[in-house]
């Protein structure tokens, strides 16, 4: 079955994946990373997209963000891609595409599923062995350090699920640290990544049904083969 067209709905958090062309590195050093977060902040601010979490890996970027109006996420990602590609190509004397086609994304159900997606992003560049040391240097170029109470590279808009972890910043950071230390079950991780790659919403059957009614689009795979004769 062909991949469903990418869906974006204002007001819902989206898990976004940007990958380097042919698996190539999109960051050679921290100068590149700083240039990227600068371009990211500019693009999201211009198009009014709230950023909840981010992780810069060697060949890809994970973002968790919420567009406030329809079409804003797509515009922000296009602007980000063009802006950073120009800087990267100029700095490294290269030409051609930096990214592997269009960005991939999934709409994430609010609640525990959304909090789990945020943990997934923060774990992407976190060394689990160092999380308990409270050393922010062990979590470079991700929002993990901010969710643990340290300064970060990009301003964040915390989701309600993070605020619900405790009454004080210390309580929230402590509760989040526990989650960051826990490994995501392989099946849950696979479901989340598959949802991103196939552009399908990630959540319960009730959530998907609600989105289908809201968007008037089929969001679940149909049965294979021809329809049964009646």
List the model feature ranges, each with a label.
Residues 1-57, 66-230:
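Short Pro-Cys-Gly-centered "Cys-loop" motif that presents a nucleophilic cysteine in a tight turn
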